[in-house]
Amino acid sequence: MWQSKGPPRVAFFSWLASLGKVLTTDNLCKRCIIVLDWCYMCKRCGESVDHLLLHCPVAFELWSLVFCLFGLHWVMPHKVIELFGRHRNIDFWRLVLHCLMWCIWSAINARYFKGFERSLLEIKSFFVHTLLVWSVALSHFSCFSLSVLLDHCNFVS
């Protein structure tokens, strides 16, 4: 997890998420902070780290995009920590995991703190754009091209 080539604050966020310590509504309730216990993304279930980043219908759509890009058929793990045990040796895959979780977290914070609700298409676009920008910044690719990113996704799988 710490060997990610992504931004350090994203690696820190992923570490907190893997420990279940991100301030979701269930964790805020444990600290006696009174909030509505519902997911701000799907507006249904109680919000836990695992629900928000893995099992929420909105997160599931984003994971489906990743699986489609990589040509993967994968059973979703129950806990965030289980994500980081898979594909350990592929830096780009780790970057994808960090980027997707960061984009979900950014979308939830935009809804919660700014009242700005991104559509699913906007969140998907934000994810692909962020992944491309991070990949170029980290020298995974020499050119800024979506087609190069998509080719690399197919190569990694």
Task: State what each model feature region is.
Residues 29, 35-157:
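Family-specific functional microsites
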Residues 1-46, 155-157:
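Helix/loop segments that flank and initiate small ligand/metal-binding modules
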